[in-house]
Amino acid sequence: MSSAIAAKTMTQTWQTVCTRADLVPYSGVAAWVETPEGPAQVAIFYLPGHAQELYAIDHHDPFSKANVIARGIVGDLKGQPVVASPIYKQHFRLEDGQCLEDESVQLRAWKVSFKGDEVWIEA
Amino acid sequence: MNTPAKPQLIVIGNGMVGHHLVEQLVEQGATERYTVIVFGEERHLAYDRVHLSEYFSGRDADSLALSTADYYAENGIELRLHEAVTAIDREAGEIVTPKGRYPYARLVLATGSYPFVPPIPGNERDGCLVYRTLEDLDAIREAAESASTGVVVGGGLLGLEAANALRGLNLDTAVVEFAPRLMPMQVDSEGGELLREKIEALGVQVLTGRATQEIVDGERSRHRMVFQDDKVLETDLIVFSAGIRPRDELARDCGLEIGERGGVVIDDNCLTSDPAILAVGEVALWNNSIFGLVAPGYQMAKAAASTLLEGGTAFAGADMSTKLKLMGVDVGSIGDAHGDRTPGARMFRFLDPLKQQYRKLVVSSDGKRLVGAMLVGDNSYYDTLLQYYANRIELPEDPAALILPAGSEAAPALGPDALPATAMICSCHNVTKADVCATIDGGAVDLGAVKGETKASTGCGGCAALLKTLVDHELESRGVEVDKSICEHFHYTRQELYDIVRVEGIKTFSELMEKHGNPETHKLGCDICKPAVASILASCFNEPITDAAHIPLQDTNDTFMANMQKNGTYSVVPRIAGGEITPDKLVVLGQVAQKYNLYTKVTGGQRIDLFGARLEDLPAIWGELIEAGFETGHAYGKSLRTVKSCVGSTWCRYGVQDSVGMAIRLENRYKGLRAPHKIKFGVSGCTRECAEAQSKDIGVIATENGWNLYVSGNGGMRPRHAELFATDLSDEELFRYIDRFLMFYIRTADRLQRTSVWRENLEGGLDYLKEVILEDSLGIGEELERQMQAVVDTYVCEWSNAISDPEKLKRFRSFVNDARPDPDIIYTTERGQLRPA
């Protein structure tokens, strides 16, 4: 288990959070990232073989107020990759965190990418 | 302080119309205004007399019943069956029964009718019976056991029904009719002749124009019937079915106005000559007519209920048009079928002596309206003709085309479009085309929903085909494509996906998606199809759900094999088969709960639920539980949950079988079985039913001789009593039928459909299910048993499997890059235990 190596500056920086082996194909895992505002929980989704293989959005579910988004079912609805909250089943677009059932709710989407086998997030 | 007592409304009679009145009272809210008491003379609650003859072809009293005692109880209506009312004391405002006197503010007579027995000397002899009630049928069945021949006196509608019943009891059957033809009310001499030919071809002797003079001892049989021309007919059994007479004696005795030929006179509001008393159904005489069909009775019931409340719905007479299938022979009669009540009426006739079909149209003198019609041999013309008649639709230029055989110059059937909004679709429940359309506009999306909302086609069922056509048409015209696809990723129903998986041996979601998924999606699936396919794969192949190929398919509960609670923690429920647990194991549960700071609660399924477990603690908790001999309880799965039991014959004074032992065997056999929804069992050791087995998907109740099996019960939001499925089964039979039942359910149910809803939607109902499971009518019994055995043989405890695999345990990290627990899970304490803050 690797610790988050965060650059403690006031600007956003790329940081490594885990490796490919920590991810679960076609599902999500949760990770901590360090941000200028403090630590944050991020849900990382891995879709091997798809045009975009990695997505990261908030792990916090604003409807249940529990940190569970990474444990939802990943799928696609009307052409958009989504995750369904495991508690009350709202769908969030992986691309930008938009909730499909409630226009006013949007999770933060984080930039995420592989560098070799390492997973990097900009936070 | 007592609330003032509500006025008492008494209903005398619990036949079809009497019961319908009760339903109308409930629906229209009369139970808030009145205290309602219903008296029924028979032992049975209201039953379906229209389908009475099916009593001899396998239906029992329960399946003919129109309602349940629970329905009455739930609506606060007192039902007093087997208590005949003997008098009405209008001065005192009371009715009298052998058990006492009951005051009424309002009284409704729904006493119905009795079969008319012609005054023939000898008609009281043993073996001379009538055909009206279930008890009559029991008497006929008993008498038939020592008989080889039977005669029905009366060749009308009920007479032919009775003749069919005798035929069903393997008697050589004859029908004796006083009129020169069969069904003289409905058909003319040509139609009657055709009917005779058809019925004789079925082996039933038909004697028309015969008046029976007397019945005496026979020489070869028990009775000899002597006719007016001194000809004779010998028989062992005689059933009188020569018409009905109103049961108006109570009304007569208390001085209500009675018609010349019987019947309690009512007005349009169903009021008798005493405004406190109403009458409905076959006892009531409206406009000098008795209505001997169920539909007009229902309309009277509706009007009567309205009269008892605000009023507004009057009875305005009823159409006596009818279509029936008597001994497989279609007979239909619409309006003035004989043309003798319409001055200047003109007739069209079509007769095909080879195909044995006869049709007649009675048309108004200007040729524009249909005033009546008669059909023998083919009722497919009925619906269209009835619409022309009932809605006064202008006839085509050549009306004869309406009765010509299809394919000739025949006019096309009247499509649903041609019907006016006022067209009556279901006359039993008074449902018009406009009502059906309104229901669809209100959101009903299929036939079932329309039937549920309007009750259309739930009376005599005669309008079923018309209703379906109309509903399909209306849905289509609103652009509703009746799409049963499970979701956008598969254009298949769950059942179709199940068959594909089974037949093609597909073992993963990705293979199924590759071969059968909708290419217009990203092929990721969704939270609808993924768990459904996961369930199907598990039912068919039973691979661990935590295997890499299956893990992304599972709901979070299955993924982590625990039940997610609202704060993101989980509850843990180890299996306690049959609710039996040793003290040692009980101690372990307490110790684990203490160590991991868990809230504990006893569940409704006789187990212990440990709440508040953090994701990262689950493997350690399970390590300790497995060490102590526990296994997973599948409380998180759409699978067998629990088998609840009472303590049974080992301890209980009343128990007749070892219910705990049976519950444990059942639970161990079916544990781990994944299904469209969760499954619960109950096993009771005697009829006291302490395990509440009749509220379970599978209920087992011990008898002196074995086990009674109940199926498709449910608690929850919409409780449903399980239905008795088979009786006095051996252990082996019990397992065999449950194997078959569950596998058939798994094969054919929709996703997330409990056995109760599945059973209710199953075409053919309980009878069909019995045929498939008990009689193996589809020939799949062994296959189903084999499939179940495969699931049983491949069972492994999912938690044991997971904790022995480090790769699988990686999934139970709350965060992949830090062992820090989730700081947002905060607890407070209540009643000595923790709960989410």
Which sequence ranges carry the predicted segments?
Chain A
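N-terminal pre-ligand scaffold of iron-sulfur
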Residues: M1-G79, R93-L94, Q106-A123
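Short cysteine clusters
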Residues: D61, S85-Y88
